[in-house]
Design a protein with these regions (language model features):
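Hydrophobic helical membrane-anchoring modules
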Residues: 1-3, 149, 173-263
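Donor nucleotide-sugar binding loop of glycosyltransferases
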Residues: 16-19, 42, 95
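A short, conserved beta-strand element in the Rossmann-like catalytic core
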Residues: 41, 65, 93
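Short, well-formed alpha-helical segments that are part of the catalytic scaffolds
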Residues: 14-29
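A conserved acidic beta->alpha catalytic loop
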Residues: 39-47
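Acceptor/aglycone-binding surface of glycosyltransferases and processive sugar-polymer synthases
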Residues: 60-79, 84, 96-179, 206-215, ...
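Short hydrophobic beta-strand elements that form part
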Residues: 8-12, 59
Length: 263
């Protein structure tokens, strides 16, 4: 546990039956207070496994998409008093053991957002990332950095940590329900002056790891460029106004009220 902070891990799941248990097994329980798994209408045993593992399990009755899944993740995390929310893909592509490092970056007060980068340690290709995806990742990142005035190593990681303030300030409901949601979050956060930090994260690419096909990758790339252009650095900064209605905004947790992770 992190003093004075309730840490909640959220797992946006879709057909994750083969990797969910391995992912959860490596999440550091001495750091995480609760784990939420949101299933996006999977047709496999993801839900049954999540419940067997004792996770807080939310099930969509229809597929809402990757971004739609994350919206539910963050809403549920805030509703149980999360101060720090760490989003981790449950496909075992990223190392769950680094969750504590990401949460500590947020708890330090130096960063509002922390990213687990596959590029910093040059582990993407070594871990099996297809060459065309690596080239596209690097190319998109260069353009995004130029447009929004950042020096991030990548914008496309599925391993992220946020402060409560970030999640309450960004207009998440207006963002895409597709994969470009991740970039919309980061660009909107930069435009509001939130500080972003990174750590290197080794990754694994294998048959069960989630991925998108070439056609959707092209659509995603175009969406990323459009998002960066809309939030380019010459555009005016936006205020950090809480967009969540007051009646839906639960109070931040207090240390004495912290609940431990259910077995």
């Amino acid at each position: 546990m992190i003093e004075h902070s309730r840490v909640v891990a959220v797992l946006p799941a879709y057909h994750a039956e083969k990797t969910l248990e391995r992912t959860v097994a490596e999440i550091p329980r001495d750091i995480v207070d609760d784990i939420i798994c949101v299933d996006d209408a999977s047709r496999d045993d993801t839900v049954a496994i999540a419940k067997r593992l004792g996770l807080r399990t939310i099930v969509h009755d229809r597929n809402l998409g990757y971004g739609g899944n994350q919206k539910t993740c963050y809403r549920e995390a805030l509703s149980i008093g999360a101060d720090i929310v760490v989003m981790l893909h449950p496909d075992y592509q990223y190392s769950p053991r680094l969750l504590g490092a990401l949460a500590q970056m947020i708890a330090s007060g130096h960063y509002d957002i922390a990213l687990g980068s596959r590029v910093l340690a040059q582990s993407a290709l070594a871990g099996g990332m297809p060459l065309y995806k690596y080239i596209a990742n690097r190319g998109l990142t260069v353009v995004e950095n130029l447009l929004i005035g950042q020096k991030l190593s990548e914008y496309h990681t599925g391993y992220r940590a946020f402060t409560r303030e970030v999640l309450e300030s960004l207009p998440l409901a207006t963002f895409s329900n597709d994969f470009v949601f991740d970039n919309e979050m980061l660009c909107a956060a930069v435009r509001r002056g939130f500080a972003i930090g990174e750590i290197s994260c080794p990754t694994r690419y294998f048959a069960e790891a989630s991925s998108i096909n070439f056609r959707r990758s092209v659509r995603y790339g175009l969406g990323v460029l459009g998002t960066a252009w809309q939030n380019a650095r010459w555009r005016p900064r936006l205020p950090r106004e809480r967009v969540m209605p007051a009646e839906q905004r639960p109070p931040a947790s207090r240390p004495a009220a912290r609940a431990s992770q259910r077995p």
